[in-house]
Amino acid sequence: LEAESRCLSWTELEFLVRDKSRRPLLERARLMGLPVSIPYDAEVPIKWQDDLFTANRTNHSPDDLKVLDFSSLWAGPLCSHLLLNLGCKVVKVESRNRGDISGSATPRLFSVLNKDKELLIVDFQNEAELESLRQMICDADIVIEGSRPRAFEALGIDRRSIRSQQTSAQHHNQLWLSLTAYGRFGAAAAWVGFGDDVAASAGVLDRSSDGGYGFVGDAIADPLAGLQAALTVKECLTRNLRGLLDFSLFRAARIALETVERLYDSPLAPLKKVRTRC
């Protein structure tokens, strides 16, 4: 914002933002790794780059499937929680130095989503532990990745690196779910996003008759992504498909919005009063 003071009130912040062009401000915020968005952003890529193929073995019962879940917060843990309820064995992988912050921020939600999963704590700075983890990834039936791709690439546990260590059978029978804010390819792969701002970017917003905007629910793109990702994984298992699912919070929010508007054959009606939240 190029402000002289680092301590701004909300009133001062609103005044500074009001005089700025949206797109340059958004681009600068993204360079700084901030979760910022423009409502109904038409420049966000909406082409999903899934890479799916038919598995080279017959379908297995969910009871026979092992899920490695590297995600945190809400979307990924909700997805693996639903897969657990289907019968899959789920192992939640956490960093020894940086665990899932939702455990302290929202302990009740964390307990509901993760209480019946096996917990694996890994020191990502320890090469021996990393190598053991790589072998676990090779053997897993489903991998849930909840970080931007470059984080896994830096550790050598990304899908391409793991592929070089897998047998053909392991690779062709593994489903890799990539859960990101805006997708894993192109410039959008580096963008930071959370449930509220990504939903706004997709157009999932409260709208008042005077043109104002407000959030819908609480970080609504997160549960939408978790639910839709679990349904998509289940569909892949039913159809014996494996490979890569490029799933994002933005994709889930857009699908939900377009589905509701298609069902009602019109854009969502504006609300009488916008609910705002800071």
Please identify what each model-predicted range represents.
Residues 10-33, 42-278:
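N-terminal helix-loop segment corresponding to the beta1-alpha1 unit
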